[in-house]
């Protein structure tokens, strides 16, 4: 199955092809392109950028990737199909049918969509917007010629004609319009001849080429396949047979350009079948090339001891576990492919990567090591892609072939003996101005087992070389420095000064005492080997007389050092095994540090989410306390109404219950229950109690509205706070039921019911009854005393006795009158008692209304907060578990590193 382009949201198949083993067609071709932004922060790692700053200087901004430039190259699955449309085709005719065809093509086969600008700028922009919304993250969208429109719609890049802008200008313009992207924009070049194609691929740094459909274009493609290492898409002529298409793909064409007409005729389906067929055939052929007899001694691990074999197997197991944990902790971390690749290469040949500035002589050094001029040399950048050199024992010249493989590597199979156990990789210069080539080198460095840094004697340790050395420190790589072109020095003293300069500064940069440096003249060594190439059967090391030329002798010393890596019985050979095993260990340690930083940040974010949720709940509780404080004013107003009514009633009682109110007393005494309500009691009902009750009902109604509006407003604010704080967390868990919303509306209005149960008429009647009783007792007492006195004087015989009887009866009347104020005060006390009881009852009712409202508010917010808190807590628990797993795997890696460091110690020595 072919790997998907990297910007799709797919993390289920992260195991990319080994960067050092010969890759298979159909895998991912790394290109400099823009892709739609991802979800979270997992692909932007918390890693310090040390490429352009001093080692002790802290970057002010967070580096966006593991690589010093801060940019990455996306991946494109090839062979594939490129759909080329015209804006008029999209906007005119049956638009829905066109978009439907494109949609189905994107789902089945198309990886790149190019829209031509034959229409007006406005129509092109509108068509680009339509396609952008349709393409989404399924493919790359390129705009022909119009960099401004590509920038405006956020396209993946542009396709430029020969007369268009330079590729580097277009790329820089697109990068400037989207500074937040970590991926380089994609720039394609539509070419017509070999010369323009060569310029576009080498000098301009185009990402891929598009050819026409004519016979001449096919011939151009045949010529380009021999010299161009970037993908080439050929336009379908419509009359090729499947066999011809398959042959084109086998020859190295990366895919076909199709049109809307091809979609309507289902031609894309047939082409897709051809692409799949080419993948199967090329995959089979490449596997056959890899299954060479010399391949049986993988990684040069010959005659390993049981202890060493055990460590190798243990490392594979621990690193696979590390990969699983990294996938679990950071599913979108693409850099884990570095570790996956390194683990897959443990059993592969030792990987020696040649790095350095362009024109430092990297290709010449490699040619000298191989004993033949296999690689192109020049004063301008000649290596535009990663060039992978593998061993082949087939001596036939036609079998010494190089292939462009879909993972971005140019793989050459050569019969050089040194390649049997060491794979050599040539890389673009560290100082090339084309960012795509620089990213190639930066991304390949972590995979290296040994870095051979080629310095040019005329400019040793330039600024770009120093920056590159700082970048490589994070991968803990071993360096071998080659001071090439050393023959430019006039004498040994100048050479020694240069060697001292390089060693002293590299010691400081790499913080190491052991700096391995060989001053050589690769060109002289190569010429010496070529001049004696007729000496068949002799080893390359014996070709030149060591004493004949110090330049050749110095190169021979370099070769001896490299060949010593092949013998595991020597100290250098043991170091090779250690370096081979430490390559994935260094990558694992670097990735673990990044993942641990991410997990720590996520833990902090989860804790902050919990704290934020608790803060919203606490804020609600504080608001409830604030409402309780503000409710005091409402209670005072309500109690004031009761108190005012009480005072008026008491004052009325004091005015009414007087002995001078003879007419009122006679009315109460002689008419009794049959008498109508007097003016005083009518005043109590109509002018005091009725208005007071009306005002109280109005006040308590407003109080209930105040409670409801405040709780509803605060509940709504809390709900919005949760939704605004976590806008993406909206699912069934956060959907509130009707009962929950009813909490904010629910109120029993106990205080209002308390007042509604009171009746002004009933209360005034009770008061009138009490007043009637006072008058009846008082006036009745006076009347009884007078009647008794009359009867006694009529029956008593003497005057003295009459006077005594009158005195006694008068005393009884006096007692009745004397008790009148007491009875009046008793009524006032009764009124006060009733008023106090009512006030307490009303205050309790208002407090209950407040308690119910605030309790419902807090309950509502707790219900709203529950799913958010649970989600944050689950996330925190999961992250804490991941932290524990990361800590455990780091401990395992540390123990494994100790075993690797002790590889050179035998079991007997370990026992001692």
From Swiss-Prot:
Residues 1-54 form a transit peptide. CDD domains: DLP_2. Residues 55-773, 823-912 are stromal. GTP binds at residues 359-364, 521. GO terms for biological process: negative regulation of defense response to bacterium; negative regulation of plant-type hypersensitive response; thylakoid membrane organization; vegetative to reproductive phase transition of meristem. The chain crosses the membrane at residues 774-794, 802-822. Changing residue 362 to M: Loss of function and no detection in punctate structures. Residues 795-801 are chloroplast intermembrane. Residues 877-904 form a coiled coil. Residues 51-71 are annotated as: Disordered. Its main location: plastid. Keywords: Chloroplast, Coiled coil, Developmental protein, GTP-binding, Hydrolase, Membrane, Nucleotide-binding, Plastid, Plastid inner membrane, Thylakoid, Transit peptide, Transmembrane, Transmembrane helix. One of its GO terms (molecular function) is GTP binding. GO terms for cellular component: chloroplast; chloroplast inner membrane; chloroplast membrane; chloroplast outer membrane; chloroplast thylakoid membrane. Disruption phenotype: Pale green leaves phenotype and delayed flowering. Decreased number of chloroplasts and heterogeneity in size in mature mesophyll cells. Abnormalities in chloroplast and thylakoid morphology, including disorganized grana stacks and alterations in the relative proportions of grana and stroma thylakoids. Lesion mimic phenotype with activation of defense response markers in the ecotype Landsberg erecta. Belongs to the TRAFAC class dynamin-like GTPase superfamily. Dynamin/Fzo/YdjA family. Mitofusin subfamily. This is Probable transmembrane GTPase FZO-like, chloroplastic. The lineage of its organism: Eukaryota, Viridiplantae, Streptophyta, Embryophyta, Tracheophyta. The gene is FZL.
């Amino acid at each position: 199955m072919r790997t998907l382009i990297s910007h799709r949201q797919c993390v289920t198949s992260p195991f990319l092809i080994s960067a050092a083993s010969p890759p298979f067609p159909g895998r991912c071709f790394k290109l400099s392109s823009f892709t739609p932004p991802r979800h979270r922060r997992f692909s932007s790692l918390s890693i310090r950028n040390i490429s352009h700053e001093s080692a002790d200087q802290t970057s002010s901004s967070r580096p966006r990737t593991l690589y010093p430039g801060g940019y990455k190259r996306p991946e494109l699955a090839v062979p594939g199909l490129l759909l080329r449309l015209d804006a008029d085709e999209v906007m005119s005719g049956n638009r829905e049918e066109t978009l439907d065809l494109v949609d189905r093509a994107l789902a089945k086969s198309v990886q790149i969509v190019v829209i031509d600008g034959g229409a007006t700028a406005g129509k092109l922009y509108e068509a680009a917007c339509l396609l952008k919304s349709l393409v989404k993250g399924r493919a790359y969208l390129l705009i022909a010629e119009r960099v401004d429109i590509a920038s405006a719609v956020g396209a993946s890049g542009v396709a430029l004609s020969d007369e268009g802008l330079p590729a580097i200008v277009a790329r820089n313009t697109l990068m400037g319009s989207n500074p937040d992207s970590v991926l380089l924009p994609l720039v394609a070049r539509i070419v017509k001849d070999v010369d323009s194609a060569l310029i576009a691929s080498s000098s301009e740094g185009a990402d891929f080429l598009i050819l026409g459909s004519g016979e001449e274009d096919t011939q151009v493609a045949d010529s380009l396949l021999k010299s161009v290492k970037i993908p080439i898409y050929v336009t379908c002529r419509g009359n090729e047979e499947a066999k011809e298409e398959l042959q084109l793909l086998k020859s190295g064409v990366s895919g076909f350009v199709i049109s809307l007409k091809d979609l309507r005729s289902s031609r894309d389906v047939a082409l897709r079948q051809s692409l799949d067929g080419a993948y199967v055939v090329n995959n089979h052929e490449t596997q056959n090339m890899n299954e060479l007899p010399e391949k049986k001694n993988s990684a040069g691990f010959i005659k390993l001891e049981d202890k060493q074999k055990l460590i190798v197997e243990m490392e594979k197991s621990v690193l696979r576990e590390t990969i699983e944990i990294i996938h679990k902790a950071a599913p979108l971390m693409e850099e884990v492919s570095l570790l996956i690749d390194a683990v897959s290469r443990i059993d592969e040949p030792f990987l020696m990567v040649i790095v350095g500035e362009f024109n430092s002589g990297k290709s010449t050094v490699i040619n000298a090591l191989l004993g033949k001029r296999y690689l192109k040399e020049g004063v301008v950048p000649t290596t535009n892609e990663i060039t992978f050199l593998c061993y082949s024992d087939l001596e036939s010249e036609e079998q010494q072939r190089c292939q462009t493989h879909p993972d971005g590597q140019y793989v050459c199979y050569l019969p050089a003996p040194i390649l049997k156990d060491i794979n050599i990789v040539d890389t673009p210069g560290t100082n090339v101005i084309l960012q795509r080539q620089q990213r190639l080198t930066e991304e390949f460095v972590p995979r290296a087992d040994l870095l051979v840094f080629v310095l040019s004697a005329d400019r040793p340790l330039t600024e770009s070389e120093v920056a590159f050395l700082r970048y490589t420190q994070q991968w803990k790589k071993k360096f071998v420095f080659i001071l090439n072109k050393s023959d430019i020095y006039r004498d040994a003293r100048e050479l020694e000064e240069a060697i001292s300069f390089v060693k002293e500064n590299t010691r400081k940069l790499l913080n190491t005492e052991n700096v391995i440096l060989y001053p050589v003249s690769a060109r002289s060594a190569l010429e010496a080997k070529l001049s004696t190439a007729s000496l068949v059967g002799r080893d390359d090391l014996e070709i030149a007389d060591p004493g004949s030329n110090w330049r050749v002798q110095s190169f021979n010393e370099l070769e001896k050092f490299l060949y010593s890596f092949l013998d595991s019985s020597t100290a250098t050979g043991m170091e090779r095994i250690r370096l081979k095993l430490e390559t994935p260990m260094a990558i694992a340690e670097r990735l673990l540090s990044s993942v641990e930083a991410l997990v720590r940040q996520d833990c902090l974010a989860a804790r902050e989410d919990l704290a934020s949720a608790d803060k919203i709940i606490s804020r609600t509780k504080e608001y409830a306390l604030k409402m309780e404080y503000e409710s005091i004013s409402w209670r005072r107003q309500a109690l004031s109404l009761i108190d005012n009514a009480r005072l008026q009633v008491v004052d009325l009682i004091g005015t009414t219950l007087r002995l001078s109110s003879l007419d009122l007393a006679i009315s109460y005494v002689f008419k009794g229950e049959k008498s109508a309500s007097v003016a005083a009691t009518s005043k109590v009902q109509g002018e005091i109690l009725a208005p007071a009750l009306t005002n109280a009902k109005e006040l308590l109604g407003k109080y209930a509205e105040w409670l409801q509006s405040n709780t509803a407003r605060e509940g709504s604010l809390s709900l919005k706070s949760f939704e605004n704080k976590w806008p993406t967390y909206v699912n069934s868990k956060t959907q509130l039921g009707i009962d929950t919303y009813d909490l904010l509306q629910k109120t029993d209005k106990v205080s209002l019911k308390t007042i509604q149960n009171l009746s002004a008429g009933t209360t005034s009647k009770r008061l009138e009854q009490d007043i009637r009783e006072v008058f009846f007792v008082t006036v009745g007492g006076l009347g009884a005393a007078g009647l008794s006195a009359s009867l006694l004087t009529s029956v008593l015989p003497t005057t003295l006795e009459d006077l005594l009887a009158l005195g006694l009866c008068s005393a009884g009347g006096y007692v009745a009158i004397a008790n009148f104020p007491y009875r009046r005060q008793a009524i006032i006390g009764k009124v006060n008692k009733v008023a106090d009881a009512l006030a307490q009852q009303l205050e309790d009712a208002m407090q209950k209304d407040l308690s119910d409202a605030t309790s419902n508010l807090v309950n509502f917010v707790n219900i709203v907060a529950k799913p958010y808190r649970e989600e944050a807590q689950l996330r925190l628990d999961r992250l804490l578990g991941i932290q524990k797993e990361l800590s455990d795997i780091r401990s395992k890696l540390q123990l494994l590193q100790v075993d690797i460091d002790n590889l050179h110690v035998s079991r007997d020595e370990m026992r001692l």
